[in-house]
Amino acid sequence: MDLIDTAFAPLAALIAAERIPGGVLGIIDADGTRAVKVAGRAQIVPEVREMTRDTWFDLASLTKVIYTTTRILEAVQAGEIELDAPLVSVLPDLRQYMPDAWERKITFRQCLGHQTPFPAVEPIYTYGRDPDLLRAFVLQRAWTAGPSVYSDINFILLGLALERLNGVRRLRDLEPNAGFAWSADPAQSAATEDCTWRYKVLCGTVHDDNCDALEGSGHAGLFGRIDAVLDFAHGLLDGSGASASTIELIRTPLSAKRTHGWERPYIGWPGGDSCSPATIGHTGFTGTGLWIDFEKGRAWALLTNRVHPTRHFDSGIFELRRAVGDIINSN
C-alpha cells in the first residue's frame, strides 16, 4: 500500500462514520514528487456535492502563515518595516488617545509569535456592520491585557498594517498568493457552517465572522485548492517560494511552541510525535492544516470541511491530524 493510502485511512474512517463530510490529503517531497487522495462530499446540506481534487477550501487560519506572515516578512526584507519596531510605526493611530497604552508598544515580531497580551478572540462582528468603523474599533479599543495566548487579534492588526503599507482600504484589494483567492465559486467549494448569523450555509465565502465583517483580515479569509497549498509548501522546501531570510525566520524559534508565524513541534501538537524538530505547521478552524518538515524534505496538507454543517459536533479532527502526521513521518 502506498504511503498516501495508509495516511489517508484515518480520514476515510471518519468520513465513513459520518463525522467529517469529506477531505483531501496531499503529500509533497522536496524533489516535487506529490500524491493526493480525495474522498467524501464537499457539501451535504441543503444539497449534496462530491469532493474532488479541484475543490476550493476556506483555509481559515492557514491565511496567517500562507499570506500574512509571508507578506510581513517580505516587507521586512524590503526595508519597509522592522520586526522589533512597534506597530505604531505603521499604525500611528493605534490607541492614539492614550500615548502610554501598552498596545502602542507591541512589535511586529511579538504579533507574529503570539507574544502579546491580546485575548485569543473577540466577537468584533457583534459591534457593528460598518467595516471602517470596526477597523477603528480594533485600533482604539482598550484591550484587556492577559497572558500571552494564540490570538487572532495579533494577525488582524498585522493585516491592518499590510493595508496601510500598500495603500488599500481592504486586505482583499491586494492580490493573494498565486493559486489562492479571497472567495471561490460556491459550486466548486467545500461548504462550511450553516451560519446562524448570516442565515445560510456558507460556501465560497469566508467562514470567520470577524473576517467577513471586516471585509478582509490578516487572520483568515484565504481560499485554496490542495495543489496550491502543496505548491506553496514546495516553494518553502526548495527555496523557490520565498527569500532565504524569510525561510530562516519562519524556522527560527520564538518560544517553545512558535516560530515567526508558525507552530513548531511540542508535546501534543497537531503534526504528531514523529516529525523532526525542523518541522513547522499550522491549522485552520474549518478543518485545514499544513506541515513542512525541512529535515526530511517533506510536507503534507490535510484539508477537510469538518465544520459542515456545524462546528458543534465531535468531528475527531484533533486526533485525525496527529494520526495522519505520525503515519507520514513513520515511513
What are these regions (language model features)?
Residues 251-256, 267-269, 309-331:
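Short, gly/Ser/Thr-rich active-site loops of penicillin-recognizing serine hydrolases
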Residues 215-221, 279-291, 304-310:
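Glycine-rich phosphate/pyrophosphate-binding beta-alpha loops
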Residues 35-37, 290, 297-306:
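Short, well-ordered beta-strand elements
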Residues 82-99:
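Short, glycine/proline-biased beta-turn/loop segments that scaffold the active-site neighborhood
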Residues 36, 43, 98-279:
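Short, surface-exposed loop or secondary-structure junction motifs
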Residues 12-14, 56, 98-99, 275-280, ...:
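Short, P/G- and charge-enriched loop/turn segments at secondary-structure junctions
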Residues 8-12, 25, 31, 58-84, ...:
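Active-site SXXK
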Residues 2-57, 80:
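Short, conserved catalytic-motif segment at the N-terminal edge
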